[in-house]
């Protein structure tokens, strides 16, 4: 427990927390229902709206009978997940911000790394915590907290990973600036957000869906694959087609965030270099110097390669 406590902090004053969830500095007291610390302070109206959205349908879900081998097989269908797992050292302290039901947190924790999965949706965290117990993973903990006032200690994590989160915040640029403070100098930031180009196919499908009162959603491969899984189909529909807050970003925009916050740009995934072959061993190694025009052309190519699902891309950086 001590190893996890030293990574947490009072969200009010950043003071140390005791084992009974009180702050040594300001005296604030917190609780941990079902073993999940609640270090979330009340948010603004839009943040609370997004939290309520996910409380109704935690995302992504676990199928009946899910096991650790199922989790690994599911994760490793993704080239990115394999590359990420390979790049992170075995003794790393990892934070996943916006972990949802914790599937990536659990996948990374199975290699005996110290992992904290943080989210503002308790219903999702309960599923993740239950899965951790079922899979026998004791190197991972889940906490309920908000990115803008997190119950987490600044500058302590070797890797901060956040995917599918910032584009659902009211101000993604400000949210990124807060996220950067959590990683130690020299540590890695792995950020996944919707791409402005790659999101175009889904936005077109969403337009048709709205105009047809959701009776017609053409050419969505995820819905087609989940035709016989109504719960998972509903979760995808809500997350992709009816989310109350969504932003989309270009690679150049994210690179600007990096520069503003003292983060050295390492690479994009998929690669923003035309003709560059993905290398499983190189996720944390700097790519060749990129040309913004080349990056623009690469992103136009992502319309086809990423647009069949959600259009999410990953940018990797190192805090200086």
PLM region spans:
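N-terminal auxiliary segments of SAM/dcSAM-dependent transferases
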Residues: 1-61
């Amino acid at each position: 427990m001590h190893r996890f406590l030293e990574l947490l902090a009072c969200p009010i004053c950043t003071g140390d927390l005791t084992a009974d969830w009180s702050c040594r500095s300001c005296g604030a007291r917190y609780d941990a229902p079902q073993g999940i610390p609640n270090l979330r302070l009340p948010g603004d109206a839009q943040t609370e709206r997004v939290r309520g959205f996910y409380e109704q349908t935690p995302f992504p879900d676990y199928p009946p009978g899910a096991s650790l081998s199922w989790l690994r097989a599911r994760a490793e269908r993704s080239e990115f997940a394999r590359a990420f797992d390979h790049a992170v050292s075995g003794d790393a302290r990892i934070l996943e911000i916006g972990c949802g039901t914790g599937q990536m947190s659990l996948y990374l924790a199975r290699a005996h790394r110290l992992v904290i999965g943080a989210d503002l949706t308790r219903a999702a965290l309960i599923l993740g915590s239950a899965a951790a117990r079922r899979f026998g993973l004791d190197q991972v903990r889940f906490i309920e907290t908000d990115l803008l006032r997190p119950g987490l200690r600044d500058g302590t994590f070797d890797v901060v990973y956040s995917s599918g989160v910032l584009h659902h915040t009211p101000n993604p640029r400000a949210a990124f600036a807060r996220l950067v403070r959590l990683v130690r100098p020299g540590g890695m930031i792995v950020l996944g957000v919707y791409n402005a180009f790659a999101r175009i196919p889904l936005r077109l499908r969403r337009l048709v869906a709205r105009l047809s009162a959701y009776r017609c959603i053409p050419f969505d491969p995820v819905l087609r694959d989940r035709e016989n899984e109504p719960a998972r189909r509903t979760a995808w529909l809500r997350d992709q087609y009816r989310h109350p807050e969504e932003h989309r970003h270009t690679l150049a925009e994210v690179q600007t965030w990096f520069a503003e916050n003292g983060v050295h740009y390492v690479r994009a995934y998929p690669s923003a270099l035309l003709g560059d072959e993905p290398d499983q061993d190189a996720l944390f190694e700097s790519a060749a110097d990129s040309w913004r025009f080349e990056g623009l052309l690469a992103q136009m190519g992502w319309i086809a390669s990423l647009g069949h699902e959600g259009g999410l891309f990953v940018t990797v950086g190192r805090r200086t």
